[in-house]
Amino acid sequence: MNIAVVGLSHKTAPVEVREKLSIPEPQIESAIAQLASYPHIDEVAILSTCNRLEIYIVTSEADQGIREITQFLAEYSKLPVLSLRQHLFMLLHDDAVMHVMRVAGGLDSLVLGEGQILAQVKTTHKLGQQYNGIKTILNRLFKQALTAGKRVRTETSIGTGAVSISSAAVELAQIKVANLAACRVVILGAGKMSRLLVQHLISKGAVEISIVNRSRDRAQELAKLFPQQPIKIHPLSEMMSVIADSDLVFTSTSATEPILDRVKLEMVLEVQRSLMLFDISVPRNVHADVNELENVQAFNVDDLKAVVAQNYESRRKIAQEAEKLLEEEVEAFDIWWRSLETVTTISCLRNKVETIREQELEKALSRLGSEFAEKHQEVIEALTRGIVNKILHDPMVQLRSQQDVEARRRCMQTLQMLFNLDAEEQFS
């Protein structure tokens, strides 16, 4: 069996490609079902965020499994395989294991050390289990990755002062305008990213903030989190009129198509009116054609890289500390992985000994008579089970703990010969 990951991220693909391969949560179930139906995919998990799409699989034939994922991605994105392939990365076993650890630890994020990714990996694990994509191997891998991510956050200072996509967008806005306090700011959307936007805008001095959202209740819940700030709430029907009176617009909605484009802005903006748009959504909320308007500037998540680069340089040493922790978690997973080879032998031995125990117990109880057997069966059964477990405990622990592959296989062969076991290897 092999673990493989195929995906693309902010490192390998521009936002125009990433938005075509964003799989929203309501579509995860059908995507897992389709991938799991392929003949060479035994387990599957999907991690989809604004900056990455990664598909993790367990497969007996890595080349075939990777080919099936690539075909799925081409069909989903409606991009030709040759065009798509240049944006994909493909990693096998040890590299795939280290990769998911780095992702969970925030070391592969656009914003080094950002905290949201750990929750997203947790969601990937939960949905993979819920929709029957994740079984024994990926379950262990994602549990180990979540442990790794938590260790990175608690045992290093990588999370202290780390910026997020939202804070990077606000920082970029601060670079582009002279004074945030003098700007009328609109946020489209009322989710977690929008909450972070409000938080960072207030910390940078913004005072006039409006939220436009489809659900008024959700927007009001967000506004209540900042009681010291008079935040205005507007329904979606007022979006364009609110934008027309604004200086800065931040977009963070779950829309799958652009909600702002050149035509819409032309209809409401005065001729000399300047406007800056910061789109942190993937798929994008703002169409690229708005940049054709003379006094309009639009920025997307890929434009945040310059801001993020400064953050990375100051945090490189912390990242190196985190890498050492990840190596420990990779080793822990690898020890477990290697122990899988012993599962069949141990299972066969247990079954054989259990069969003998049950047969001998039945003989003993029949000799003791029904009255005695009924009265003491539970005690005698517990006694025999305890003896069997204690006898088997040390050999099983020793077998699992053999680090050397050849030594472990010799131990298995010895057990199989001594106990006349019919065990076939399932893992190689």
From Swiss-Prot:
Keywords associated with the record: Chlorophyll biosynthesis, NADP, Oxidoreductase, Porphyrin biosynthesis
Gene Ontology biological-process annotations: chlorophyll biosynthetic process; protoporphyrinogen IX biosynthetic process
Marked site positions, Important for activity: H99
Pathway participation: Porphyrin-containing compound metabolism; protoporphyrin-IX biosynthesis; 5-aminolevulinate from L-glutamyl-tRNA(Glu): step 1/2; Porphyrin-containing compound metabolism; chlorophyll biosynthesis
Record field: catalytic activity: (S)-4-amino-5-oxopentanoate + tRNA(Glu) + NADP(+) = L-glutamyl-tRNA(Glu) + NADPH + H(+)
PROSITE patterns per the UniProt record, alphabetical: GLUTR (PS00747)
Enzyme class: oxidoreductase
Active-site residues, as the UniProt record annotates them: C50 (nucleophile)
Annotated positions binding NADP(+): G189, A190, G191, K192, M193, S194
Annotated substrate binding sites: T49, C50, N51, R52, S109, E114, G115, Q116, Q120
InterPro entries (UniProt xref): 4pyrrol_synth_GluRdtase, 4pyrrol_synth_GluRdtase_dimer, 4pyrrol_synth_GluRdtase_N, GluRdtase_CS, GluRdtase_dimer_dom_sf, GluRdtase_N_sf, NAD(P)-bd_dom_sf, Shikm_DH/Glu-tRNA_Rdtase
Coiled-coil positions: none
PANTHER family: GLUTAMYL-TRNA REDUCTASE 1, CHLOROPLASTIC
Domain notes for this protein: Possesses an unusual extended V-shaped dimeric structure with each monomer consisting of three distinct domains arranged along a curved 'spinal' alpha-helix. The N-terminal catalytic domain specifically recognizes the glutamate moiety of the substrate. The second domain is the NADPH-binding domain, and the third C-terminal domain is responsible for dimerization.
Family classification: Belongs to the glutamyl-tRNA reductase family.
Known role: Catalyzes the NADPH-dependent reduction of glutamyl-tRNA(Glu) to glutamate 1-semialdehyde (GSA).
Additional remark text: During catalysis, the active site Cys acts as a nucleophile attacking the alpha-carbonyl group of tRNA-bound glutamate with the formation of a thioester intermediate between enzyme and glutamate, and the concomitant release of tRNA(Glu). The thioester intermediate is finally reduced by direct hydride transfer from NADPH, to form the product GSA.
Subunit structure: Homodimer.
UniProt-recorded name of the protein: Glutamyl-tRNA reductase
Organism of derivation: Nostoc punctiforme (strain ATCC 29133 / PCC 73102)
Native organism taxonomy: Bacteria, Bacillati, Cyanobacteriota, Cyanophyceae, Nostocales
Gene: hemA
